[in-house]
Amino acid sequence: MNVSRALRVTAFAVAALLGGQALAAGTPALVVEVESGRVLHAERATDPWYPASITKLMTTYVALDKVRSGQLSMDTLLTVTDGAAALPPSKMGFKPGTQIRLDNALKILLVKSANDVAATIADNIGGSTDGFAALMNAQAQRLGMTGSHFANPHGLPDERNQTTARDMAILARALLREFPEYQDLFHIGAVQFGRRIMRNTNGLIGRYPGADGMKTGFICSSGFNVVATATRNGRHLITVVLGAPSANERTMQAAELFDRGFNSRVNFTNPELTALPASANATPPDMRSVICDRRGPVPQEEDAPVVAEDDTSNIPNLFSSDVMAFAGDTQKPVRTVLGPRTAVQPERVWVGLNPPSEAELAAQAAAEEAAEQARQKKRAASSKKNGKQAAKKPDVTPVIEEGDKAKSKGRVSVTVKPVAGQDKKAPAKKDQKAQASSKAKSAAN
């Protein structure tokens, strides 16, 4: 592990220790073999946690179950409701009444993680958020997800939402085993809607060899979550990471766990996923103080560009000794290297039943271009207006926004004050001269 990354992880550990006893035991991590259902590595695997957008895996499961039963098809048109359209980002921004096929909705859901699309699926299948949540919880109970409860289809903050690493691995395994014909949904590198290209928020897709799914999630209270799958030499593994301090750390931790998992073998001593002991904790910890209420740039769901990182050390276990580690882990150092994503051809998605014609695509592109130009013009006008207002003030101190702190290294705040002894009436004289000049020009015309 390089020095900078070690310092970041250590800083997170210290922050977690300061954040309370609930955080002092580290964050959940789990590696499971799909074929056998046996556990290769587990840490706090049954502790309750806020799921954030990995909730959308259960939304997908409920939808695919309806397709399997014949109640829906992948061509079924879903209608965007007022409630769905009103949800906060991440979203597509579809207007109420817009219709979209279920297959396109699922692609957008799993790649873009759009909350308005999740709610559209829920409203059309369950009749309402509560109705769909009841379907989600019924499926969770049937699958044996004993530590999970879902209150909405998207994972936006709600204290009633909770899950565990174990339960999400059960769900991922069910999706893989029960719906093999739809596995391609989970490893789409990017989707394209009109001129917009949206890449998968899963930082392993296109970067980790063999990565083939599934879903990321992030809210301040959960930290950075991921349920990931990868295949190597015919062997399929599921890795769950909950509560990572950043999107990059989430990706790197999952990659390290996969490497160690593929270097380990399952035998009779490995417990089955369903046999993991229950946690003594009843409620999820709130990670907000560690993840969001701290100095620095605002956390982002997607990975920033990552330089390849090598790791020939054990996965840092900074807190807990109650961990089921990989067999022979210390004897098998691994080298985890992640480079930039490989280029992918985005899958086109659209609204309506049929894909748009070339003429319709051109018209849509023109409309989007006009809308973008209008937004830029509005931003420019707003910036110009703010600049004029700032120019009127005698003292001006540039303000660095929270999200720009990472870009502002070396930048200092400058206070502009009137020079001592300067004639305060000078600007007025200048204005008078300008007015006289203007009158002269008017007279000449």
Model-derived regions: residue spans:
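Extended interaction regions within the primary functional domain
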Residues: 11, 15, 192
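Active-site-adjacent loops and short helices of periplasmic peptidoglycan-processing enzymes
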Residues: 14-166, 175-176
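Domain-terminus/edge residues, biased toward the C-terminal soluble/receptor-binding domains
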Residues: 146-149, 157-162, 166-421, 428-429, ...
